[in-house]
Amino acid sequence: MRTPLLSLENLSIYLNGFKGDAKKLVSNININIHRGEFVALIGESGSGKSLSALSTVGLLPSAIKASGKGKWLNLNYDLEDHNSLKMFRGKEIGFIFQEPLVSLNPLHTIGKQIGECITTHAHIPNADLKDKVIALLKDVKLDDPERRFNHYPHQLSGGQRQRVMIAMALSNKPKLLIADEPTTALDVTIQKEILDLLHSLRASYDLSILFITHNLKIVKNLADRLYIMKEGEIIETGKTEDVFKKPTHAYTKDLIEPKIKIIKSRLNTSKILLSAENLSVKYKGPRSLFRSSSKDFCALNKVFLNIKLGETLGVVGESGSGKTSLALAILKLIDYQGDIKLHLPEPRLRKKERLKNYRRNVQIVFQDPFSSLSPRLSIRDIIGEGIISHRIFSKEQVEEKILLALSRVDLEKDTLERYPHEFSGGQRQRIAIARAIIMEPKLLILDEPTSSLDAAIQKQIIKLLIDLQKDLNLSYLFISHDLELVSTISHRMVVMKDGMIVDEGTPARLLRYSKNEYTKRLVESSIF
């Protein structure tokens, strides 16, 4: 039997150390990774997958402790001994984090940061260091590496920053690369490029890879073996082909089944709810003492669209295509040129009150409910905050509406006195939806509402949204980079690129018959 490169035995992870009130986050799991293997660790948010990976190199937060044994080839080490873990970090085990903009230092160039990773473990003359860094940037296929060497993280796109993170992780030629959700925040075309890059680097660097994700689909053709995690336990493991053919656990079966087996709501009217004409958004370029003006950035360029009553309009496009600027403009949260009109009876109100009334009818659900929900407010206060601000309902009426909104998203009454950190990602998104629908809006803007959720929870949230649309006659502006998901829920779709709508039509037409080259590329990238 081959000796594993890395073994984790009886790994348990606790919140509040090992005290009496400690909460067990991960329970007695075992993981083996062999030389040259691509192993995927799959689970929803809060399952313990990222904590398990961080424990291998001693990067757990101070309030969280790990117990268990690790084995690197034939060397045993204690997961509680941080000094022994330091010798692996960076040199033997490289780590790629989910959000490179947070992980990279904004004050230093990428060349300097990669160079520091190298000199931490090796003595290299400065004359040779730059050449080594540029060679790494070439290996990760970063365009124009000589020029990028002197760039700062904010000057790079999300995909470029992730390539820099990969270069840093590879800088000391580790034997194992741990990639923690490295493609979650990326659009489909860049996601595919990063996955292809990892696949090629595995061969050229003779790497083992531990790939952590909530998306089982993306590792189907990459991983040799799978570990499926749920609520801190490994519930299924095996060769990828075997798990996909004959999953044994109900949760795994739910992850593997086609994304959504539900029927979108029928359109019963052609009446327009909202129209946007000649819509443009420009952001001012940087100013300085020595330069009074610079070129403004055009985020939206003369966009025309309309949304019907009860319709879901899907918006797809890569990062930087203008999707979020479109949402913010429709919410009237940023300055714009053009005309946005909500085709509803308007009461006679002052200008300030008209805007308040407009925003009551147009609500938004954000991508990350953990960031958009205040950690200091109870769920009762979060859901009721918006409707209380309008001061048109009594205390009893507000309470009644809070309970109704909660029941509509299938959450129990005892939820109200708890706080966001006590809930899973899917539950937090239900709370965010309840906060939006309590306002009784006509249009709900859904900005990547399921991108951070695993397939099983994603299906539940999409089914909930479709049920709410049928019950409340809601219109949706559904923004996502997931073409398959958008096509499932949408009645019509628009494709955005460089601030413009470059293609539009029914999902069937865009996915099968579009003649637009950009749309074709998005479709091809979304099929792994």
What is the predicted role of each segment?
Residues 69-87, 125, 196, 339-357, ...:
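ABC ATPase NBD Q-loop/coupling interface
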Residues 128-147, 397-414, 524:
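Conserved ABC ATPase "signature" region
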Residues 151-156, 160, 419-423, 427:
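Conserved ABC ATPase signature
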Residues 171-175, 438-442:
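A short, proline-enriched helix->beta-strand linker immediately N-terminal to the Walker B motif
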Residues 219-221, 486-488:
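A short, surface-exposed alpha-helical micro-motif characterized by mixed small hydrophobic
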Residues 234-238, 246, 504-505, 513:
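ABC ATPase "signature
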